[in-house]
Amino acid sequence: MKLQRILLTSALLSACVISSACSAGDSDNPDGKGGSGTGGASTSQGGAANASGGAAMGGASLGNGGSGTGGSVAAFGGASNSGSGGGANGGNGSGGATTGSGGAATAGSSGSGGRSAGGVSNAGGSAAKGGSTSVAGSSSSAGSGNGGSVGSGGSTGAASAEDEGADCQVGTLPDSGALTANSKLPDPFKKLDGTRIASKSEWRCRREEIKKLAEKFVYGEKPAKPTMVTGTVSNSSVTVNVSHNGKSSSFSASISLPSGTGPFPAVVVVGGFGADTTTIKNAGAAIISYDPLAVGKEGTPRNNKQGAFYTIYGSSSTTGLLAAWGWGVSRIIDVIAQSSGSVIKADAIGVTGCSRYGKSAFLIGVLDQRIALTMPIESGSAGVPIWRGIPGEGAQSLSSAYGEQPWFGDAFGAFTSSPTKLPIDTHEIVAMVAPRGLFIMDNPHIANLGPKSAHVAALGGAEVYKALGAGDNISYWSDVQDGTHCAVRPEWKDPLTKSIKKFLLKSGSDPGVIKASSKASGNLADWRDWQTPTLN
């Protein structure tokens, strides 16, 4: 194995030199600061070259997490850097339909894990505004150790709206100057008015509060659907045309269909590397290959952002790239939803990506409730890991992540050295996906990625899943052997297949699993001073 790895390293380094795909790296940065650029094809797992930017779709690779300087390895689709390398699924609770707006569901009511409005059962349908998610079985505690189911029951279906809480009356958000330090993770169940939610139906608007806080202090605003979104869907591509306030832009994504007869569920693969597309297609889902750099370009200053999003909302927009990239996927879903539905199912869409595109996949799934399955891979700082944990873990610093690319919104710059002042943390961002499917994949061998902090975020978010009766719908898996960044891993093949079958094909019911490596296991008890309530 060591000899094979040495030979692979030598070959990839040679390819790196020949193709001029290498860029200067940063020892604190798993993606590499030289990610964007011009010219230079990069090596991908499938062997395809990418001549747009020095890194493959802007992503840089890591070699086995080793530290030091000198040539690192171009691994599975990312361009190499000179510099150091630095869940299964949830169960379908039988009889999980809700009763009307704000009504509590009971196990045994009609429907099959679905959500409904006005008391009408709906297998896999969208949630009513104010409607609660059903509980089909009791939830169990998700521990910080390896393995184990994280709960049971709950809906698995995506919502029919991008933001189901858009009509919620959110109170006054705090000013940054009024924020005080809190070393513990904020209570996800505590509303802006200081009271805690007591029912599942209240989560809809509590979620909206968290969303508004995240947009104000962390990511920048993700605007709602523009005035006009049109486009086409074919067997090979989806095109998107957007018009808003007298401005217009367009972009497209390619489609690769699995065998069989459509329409098919689909997984949006952000950035083009790190995702196990073979397993995804073999499970029966199409691949939508999304180039986020067409929507928000890397390598631009914060006061002159470029791409389809910024053409509409202005180059000086304070919205960061992660939210802008999410806006692009939401517009793709708009077009699919408006199409004939003969190619792609609009209500069975997932999203995945690795490294910087793992950060993107995470937020894409968070901010669009029409996405049924969110699968971030090795997302690192600005992704899943709790911000409060990053300084103590030795992960890429928040100031480094903020300065590397305008991923965060501009406002986050005030918190890079004081994350304890933030009124939210990523366990609440994780919780925003609930009760939909979430499968977080991580790498315990690269401390730079913050895997301990990511594990804590998953455990904290899982508390909300359990409170909503959807504990089976979240998984976290970092128990893997290969430390290569963004590698396609055999340990994830089975849970990936089961996740797709459950959340996209609606044909599975496997319980969620928290399976953390002993190399990077976090402990939620060290980070919280609140307890999970029993919601009505």
Task: Pin down the residues of each PLM region.
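Sec-dependent bacterial lipoprotein signal peptides
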Residues: 1-20
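Ser/Thr-rich, Pro/Gly/Ala-heavy low-complexity intrinsically disordered linkers and tails
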Residues: 16-163
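Alpha/beta-hydrolase-fold serine-hydrolase catalytic core, especially in secreted/extracellular enzymes
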Residues: 161-252, 257-262, 434-536
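Loop/turn elements at helix/coil->beta-strand transitions in domains of secreted/extracellular proteins
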Residues: 263-267, 283-287, 345-348, 369-373, ...
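Cap/lid segment of the alpha/beta-hydrolase catalytic domain
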Residues: 269-340, 346, 380-389
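Extended catalytic-interface subdomain
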Residues: 324, 351-354, 376, 409-411, ...
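Primarily recognizes the serine-hydrolase "nucleophile elbow" in alpha/beta-hydrolase
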Residues: 331-394, 403, 408, 418-419
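Mobile cap/lid helix-loop segments that gate and shape the active-site cleft of serine hydrolases
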Residues: 378-429, 450-458, 464-471
